[in-house]
């Protein structure tokens, strides 16, 4: 059974790095943070990155059941990256299936109509999780596809999936530069130059009145939609009411179906059911 804990919106002053609203806001304003984070996790030098302008296409994928990535970037070597801050507490199975779904979106999006699948770009999906994955055995998991009969053979599909679990064990191979990031995700004070820079950027954002007002508007609309969904569910039935609420959140707050369902407290194991009814 999937374990999922619904989250409620925090006040503007309470937002931290692990809240997806603040995570996306700060990181998107500071591409150098994205580049540095990739370098820390991948332990390689990343050349210049640019934001991938595909949100419209992503929303229209899969009969409108697409997703809106937190940070979707491409480097100068044409490798595409998706970096996601996971707010809900997912079971390992649910998180793995979510990555599988994201990979499908990646692949569909990276090809233009009529292009050969051989032109699929190298892709790396990274989930930042402030909770345990696979019983917390590790803090950093990197997955590729290997042959079961001969594990020295790598399937050259150029896909990589990475999970950074701040609640997992710090194994000997945990990159030293990643440890301050894990600590910061766990609510500890920033201790490295990188996390201190992020922390300072977050503090500055909180002093920008227009950003505060934008969040308050977002918070108010989300609460209105949640209340609408509750009342709709009482009058029209639980499922029908939530379907209407999902649609309202998508229209009014420009949320993806997935984030709308998350905001309404729908468990990830139920996502496919509700998607089929939209």
Regions found by a protein language model. Name each.
Residues 1-210:
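Conserved single-residue anchors adjacent to enzymatic active/cofactor-binding motifs
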Residues 2-13, 81-86, 174-278:
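Short, charged alpha-helical interaction segments and adjacent helix-coil junctions
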């Amino acid at each position: 059974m999937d374990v999922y804990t619904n989250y409620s919106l925090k006040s503007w002053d309470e937002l931290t790095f692990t809240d997806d609203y603040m995570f996306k806001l700060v990181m998107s304003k500071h591409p150098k943070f994205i580049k540095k984070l990739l370098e820390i996790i991948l332990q390689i030098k990343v050349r210049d990155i640019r934001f991938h302008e595909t949100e419209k296409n992503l929303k229209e994928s899969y009969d409108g059941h697409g997703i809106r990535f937190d940070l979707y970037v491409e480097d100068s070597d044409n490798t595409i990256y998706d970096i996601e801050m996971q707010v809900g507490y997912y079971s390992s199975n649910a998180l793995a299936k979510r990555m599988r779904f994201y990979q499908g979106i990646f692949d569909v999006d990276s090809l233009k109509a009529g292009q050969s699948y051989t032109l699929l770009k190298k892709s790396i999906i990274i989930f930042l999780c402030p909770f345990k994955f696979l019983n917390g055995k590790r803090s950093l998991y990197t997955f590729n596809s290997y042959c079961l009969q001969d594990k020295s053979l790598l399937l050259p599909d150029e896909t990589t999936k990475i999970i950074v679990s701040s609640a997992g064990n710090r194994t000997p191979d945990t990159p030293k530069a990643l440890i301050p990031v894990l600590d910061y995700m766990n609510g500890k004070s920033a201790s490295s130059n990188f996390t201190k820079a992020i922390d300072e950027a977050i503090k500055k954002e909180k002093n920008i009145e227009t950003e505060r007002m934008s969040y308050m508007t977002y918070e108010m609309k989300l609460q209105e939609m949640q209340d609408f969904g509750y009342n709709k569910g009482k009058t029209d039935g639980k499922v029908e009411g939530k379907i209407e609420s999902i649609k309202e959140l998508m229209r009014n707050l420009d949320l993806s179906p997935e984030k709308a369902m998350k905001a309404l407290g729908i468990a990830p194991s139920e996502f496919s059911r509700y998607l089929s009814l939209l």
